[in-house]
Amino acid sequence: MSRLAHNKALPYKIIVDLSFHRTRLPSDVSSLIKFEQRPAIINIHGLLGSHVMFHSLNKLLSRKLDADIFSVDVRNHGISPKAIPYDYTTLTNDLIYFIETHIGLERPIYLLGFSMGGKIALLTTLYKNINIRKCISIDLPPYETPELDPMILQNYDLIMRIIRRDVKILRGSPSWQKKVLELFKSLECNKRKCGGAVALYFANGFLSVKSNNVHQAQLHYEQQQHDPYINYSMPLSSMPNLLDEVKKWPDLSNQRDFFQKGTASRKVLFMKGLQSNFINNDYSLLRYNFPCADVREFNTGHNLLLENPEDSFKCILNFFAEETLDFE
């Protein structure tokens, strides 16, 4: 995809059909029927990510809970369709449509969202007409967050500098992947604990584009592009307000026919990184929409799954396992 393609106006679509990955299913019919009567788990990734971020976690959850797990790509991320708008209400409606289409309204559902995906999960939990039983939001609250983490801002800035060609890396050039990864690793915010994994997370939008491996000289003349530099997987040039949208929490006051305040039957857990500023220390703010919400604290920054994988996995497992056993 050329740079010009990234600058084209995105189509307007009220709903898109999200791409997803599903964990293994039982091979025999009787086991499959029983399997699909138990809660489904849906993972929603964070900003600039994709369903791939949950791959290792899903293997563990699947083994421990024998769970049916769906990992989705949010619109404009991964291989899901590219379209506007990209506000939280639209992203939530995409997920609701996914549930209606691929899982159904009656089946119990557990939601697990990281960062931006946490807000999408929380909004979906407030939707009346689907059977959400549990929701985990990893380090993002159900209200506007005025400031973004420097880690997000610095990595986003580097991505945009490469997209704008302030930093030029030729497609198909020797060791171009290494050059990209080293650029992200050199950011001050990525020199902390687990910084290499964070650098890979943000660099992956370049590394995952197959056409970036093909040098201009290897193309037939009619296929050659005026712009020979690497491209990003997301149409960020067509999403100028992305970071502002990520900060927001929608006004639901005029949508009470569809969204309701949280109830005791829908358990909500917030996993907070104590070194992160996203979730305010006043936890009563969380309980405005989710009166029965619980909070678990971790001595980490925003990326607590990377910084403390053992304790964060135990927290997720225990929260989901508690009721799952009742469906045996």
UniProtKB/Swiss-Prot annotation:
Uses in industry and biotechnology: S.cerevisiae produces only trace amounts of ethyl acetate. These traces help S.cerevisiae disseminate in the environment by attracting fruit flies. However, as ethyl acetate is a key flavor compound and the most abundant ester in wine and beer, ethyl acetate-producting genes such as ethanol acetyltransferase are relevant for the fermented foods and beverages industry.
Keyword Transferase listed: yes
Domain AB hydrolase-1: start-end pairs: 39-309
Catalytic function, reaction form: ethanol + acetyl-CoA = ethyl acetate + CoA; acetyl-CoA + H2O = acetate + CoA + H(+); ethyl acetate + H2O = ethanol + acetate + H(+)
EC number: 2.3.1.268, 3.1.2.1, 3.1.1.-
Active site residues according to the UniProt entry: 115 (charge relay system), 139 (charge relay system), 302 (charge relay system)
Top-level taxonomic group: Eukaryota
Knockout-associated phenotype: Reduces ethyl acetate production by at least 50%.
Keyword presence, Hydrolase: yes
Biological function: Alcohol acetyltransferase that catalyzes the synthesis of ethyl acetate from ethanol and acetyl-CoA. Can also function as a thioesterase by hydrolyzing acetyl-CoA in the absence of ethanol, as well as esterase hydrolyzing ethyl acetate.
Family: Belongs to the AB hydrolase superfamily.
Protein name: Ethanol acetyltransferase 1
Organism whose genome encodes this protein: Saccharomyces cerevisiae (strain ATCC 204508 / S288c)
